[in-house]
Swiss-Prot record:
The lineage of its organism: Eukaryota, Viridiplantae, Chlorophyta, Ulvophyceae, OUU clade. Gene3D superfamilies: Ribosomal protein L14. This is Large ribosomal subunit protein uL14c. It comes from Tupiella akineta. Belongs to the universal ribosomal protein uL14 family. Keywords: Chloroplast, Plastid, Ribonucleoprotein, Ribosomal protein, RNA-binding, rRNA-binding.
């Protein structure tokens, strides 16, 4: 569960290292984001000499949450950290690589490009 002011790791090579969620998209009263939801975030830590700089506002999709999600078959999946992938206006990733595992729920949410770049889909 990602709420505003939550710090997330970045799971791609877009140049950002840490993001802070400032808004959860998807309705005027939606307060928390789960895996596959789009958020507006601010870059809090960045790699030098890369396109994304500190204090840039970006769109990102949540790919891992520490709280986890329960699937329809009853299994429960939980990750070690909260992580997101930076995306552009067309919902394509801005980086060319994705690090770490991602959840299978991204495929249902039409983020197939992120799923294909990921080394492991759980």
């Amino acid at each position: 569960m990602i709420r505003p002011q939550t710090i997330l790791n970045v799971a791609d090579n877009s140049g950002a290292k840490k993001l802070m969620c400032i808004r959860v998209l998807g309705g005027s009263y939606k307060q928390s984001a789960n895996i596959g939801d789009i958020i507006i975030a601010v870059v809090k830590q960045a790699t030098p000499n890369m396109p994304l700089k500190k204090s840039d506002k970006v769109r990102a999709v949540v790919v891992r949450t520490a709280q986890g999600v329960q699937r329809e078959n009853g299994t429960f999946i939980r990750f070690d950290d909260n992580a997101a992938v930076v995306i552009n206006k067309d919902d394509n990733p801005r980086g060319t690589r994705v690090f770490g595992p991602v959840a299978r729920e991204l495929r249902d949410r039409k983020f197939t490009k992120i799923v294909s770049l990921a080394p492991e889909v759980l």
